[in-house]
Amino acid sequence: MKNILSWMLMFAVALPIVGCDNGGGSQTSATEKSMVEDSALTDNQKLSRTFGHLLSRQLSRTEDFSLDLVEVIKGMQSEIDGQSAPLTDTEYEKQMAEVQKASFEAKCSENLASAEKFLKENKEKAGVIELEPNKLQYRVVKEGTGRVLSGKPTALLHYTGSFIDGKVFDSSEKNKEPILLPLTKVIPGFSQGMQGMKEGEVRVLYIHPDLAYGTAGQLPPNSLLIFEVKLIEANDDNVSVTE
């Protein structure tokens, strides 16, 4: 059973679904009906049905490409009934690789176009300073009064990273403590964007994917990254004293 669960969850993580109707008109009555039905289930039935919910939830977490949920369920039942799949394992792997590759390339192009459009428009906004043409910009949110950072020291800071749509993908604030970060270990746009910051300053960095993770890493490929950074302390001699 453990092997079955592991395989199904591993499969589910990679694939999204289509065909789900989330119409809100009958949501309350549907929920009440579901609660009545659930109360009549045995413990094993509850466990099994909850696993189905978990599988569906895992399937819907990614938007790389879509599968037909109805056909997914039919395929599971066919396997249980001992029937053959419409594709051999080799054919499936080949077609899946082709679909994933095409989806990845489309997402790369789409995100790159969005990043370049954003930077082009953003540089015209008040307070935005361009450090590298169409690649790296920043805006000062709060002026600092401490020492000026230069080079790549180890910096004590708070940061929040987000995408163009405002979705946060990482933040030091989640741990309530600032992070001590060697600027030699971060993406180029982050360390370059912090140059000239004063201790106490809060700055928003706008980083083109070429100066971030590009098409590699765990984030969506060619994502423009936005970091709000507060420099608390530059822990290195490679700083200058503010006049």
Curated annotation (Swiss-Prot):
Matches recorded under PROSITE patterns: FKBP_PPIASE (PS50059)
EC numbers for this chain: 5.2.1.8
Annotated Gene3D superfamilies: 3.10.50.40, Peptidyl-prolyl cis-trans isomerase, FKBP-type, N-terminal domain
GO CC aspect terms: cell outer membrane
Primary location recorded for the protein, binned into one broad class: membrane
Every PPIase FKBP-type domain range: 152-235
Keywords assigned: Cell outer membrane, Isomerase, Membrane, Rotamase, Signal
Protein name: Peptidyl-prolyl cis-trans isomerase Mip
Top enzyme class: isomerase
Role played: PPIases accelerate the folding of proteins.
Keyword presence, Membrane: yes
Membership in a protein family: Belongs to the FKBP-type PPIase family.
